Amino acid sequence: MSITTERKQQLIKEYAITENDTGSSAVQCAILTERINNLTEHFKSNHKDHTSRRGLLILVGRRRRLLNYIKKNNVSKYLDLISKLGIRKIK
């Protein structure tokens, strides 16, 4: 259900701007997307887990705010990121 350390390092390496970049908005957004995808898979077999569903909604909101920030500052980076992550545009 949670993201493994190896997978997190993979995501950091893939989305990082520089070599030691672990906190840029693109990296944070990629990690949040991975956590959201894991929780979505969890709900396919545990549909009554309402506590985790609230956590999922919090993660989705956090990712939305990060994507809004990226979109406001660099539209081309935003479009590239959402295509790599496979998510829809924010209205």
Swiss-Prot record:
GO molecular-function terms, A-Z: rRNA binding; structural constituent of ribosome
Q: Which GO terms describe its biological process?
A: translation
Pfam families in the cross-refs: Ribosomal_S15 (PF00312)
Annotated membrane-spanning segments are none
Report the SUPFAM superfamilies cross-referenced here: S15/NS1 RNA-binding domain (SSF47060)
Q: Which keywords does this chain's UniProt record carry? A: Ribonucleoprotein, Ribosomal protein, RNA-binding, rRNA-binding
* InterPro entries linked to this entry: Ribosomal_uS15, Ribosomal_uS15_bac-type, uS15_NS1_RNA-bd_sf
Q: Which GO terms describe its cellular component?
A: cytosolic small ribosomal subunit
- Alphabetical list of HAMAP family matching this protein: Ribosomal_uS15_B
Cross-referenced PANTHER family: RIBOSOMAL PROTEIN S15, BACTERIAL AND ORGANELLAR (PTHR23321), SMALL RIBOSOMAL SUBUNIT PROTEIN US15M (PTHR23321:SF26)
Q: What does this protein do?
A: One of the primary rRNA binding proteins, it binds directly to 16S rRNA where it helps nucleate assembly of the platform of the 30S subunit by binding and bridging several RNA helices of the 16S rRNA.
Assembly notes: Part of the 30S ribosomal subunit. Forms a bridge to the 50S subunit in the 70S ribosome, contacting the 23S rRNA.
Which family is it part of?
A: Belongs to the universal ribosomal protein uS15 family.
Record protein name field = Small ribosomal subunit protein uS15
Species per Swiss-Prot/TrEMBL record: Rickettsia massiliae (strain Mtu5)
Supply the gene name.
rpsO
